[in-house]
Swiss-Prot record:
Designated name of the protein: Allatostatins MIP
One GO MF term: signaling receptor binding
Subcellular location(s) per record: Secreted
Modified residues (Tryptophan amide): 74, 159, 175, 189, 202
Phenotype when the gene is knocked out: In both sexes RNA-mediated knockdown results in decreased day- and night-time sleep due to reduced sleep-bout duration. The number of sleep-bouts is not affected.
Function: Ligand for the sex peptide receptor (SPR). Stabilizes sleep and maintains sleep homeostasis to inhibit the activity of wake-promoting circuits, such as those that involve the pigment dispersing factor (pdf) neurons. Regulated by the circadian clock network and pathways associated with a sleep homeostat. May also have a regulatory role in gut motility.
């Protein structure tokens, strides 16, 4: 009787082992045949990798749009058109280039008047509130055109025409005309010098004295 119970117990255990191994094989085959999942730890791409790829594509698009907007401002002409206001050059947005020799004392207001082309008559036609200035101010205004003229000539001489200075003459003499040393140089190779003595030694027979 006890022997029969032991046999039944062993048989039941064997059936359980067989069923367990069969279930394990079924689970393994099902996981191998299923498509890769996107869950972390699965066989496919993780959710973080997918998000990184999407963010990289969005970043590329944003960079492309930003580059195009930047390129429109300096890489090609903008559609806004050219500047049509001529007064923009006198408002400080554009600073004119001033080339001087360092001797002029012209101030900025005087330079603006000279650059804008206003004449002395237009400068004297000031508003009524400016006519109430002191006599010293009027004296300064009376002598201002001469000061402007001298200052303009002093500035113009540096780049508008040749300055008749001794330094310019020395510089011009160095390459603009021949100096006396050129004649000495020309005598060395530009003309024959003692050629009769030279050709007698190698160019042809020398005239030997007869006995």
């Amino acid at each position: 009787m006890a022997h029969t119970k032991t046999r039944r117990t062993y048989g039941f255990l064997m059936v359980l082992l067989i069923l367990g191994s069969a279930c394990g094989n079924l689970v393994a085959s099902g996981s191998a045949g299923s498509p890769p999942s996107n869950e972390p730890g699965g066989g496919g791409l993780s959710e973080q990798v997918v998000l990184d790829q999407l963010s990289e594509s969005d970043l590329y698009g944003n960079n492309k749009r930003a580059w195009q907007s930047l390129q429109s401002s300096w890489g090609k002409r903008s559609s806004s058109g050219d500047v049509s206001d001529p007064d923009i050059y006198m408002t400080g947005h554009f600073v004119p280039l001033v080339i001087t020799d360092g001797t002029n004392t012209i101030d900025w207001d005087t330079f603006e008047r000279l650059a804008s082309g206003q004449s002395a008559q237009q400068q004297q036609q000031q508003p009524l509130q400016q006519q109430s200035q002191s006599g010293e101010d009027f004296d300064d205004l009376a002598g201002e055109p001469d000061v402007e003229k001298r200052a303009w000539k002093s500035m113009n001489v540096a780049w508008g025409k040749r300055r008749q200075a001794q330094g310019w003459n020395k510089f011009r003499g160095a390459w603009g005309k021949r100096e006396p040393t050129w004649n000495n140089l020309k005598g060395m190779w530009g003309k024959r010098d003692q050629w009769q003595k030279l050709h007698g030694g190698w160019g042809k027979r020398s005239q030997l004295p007869s006995n």
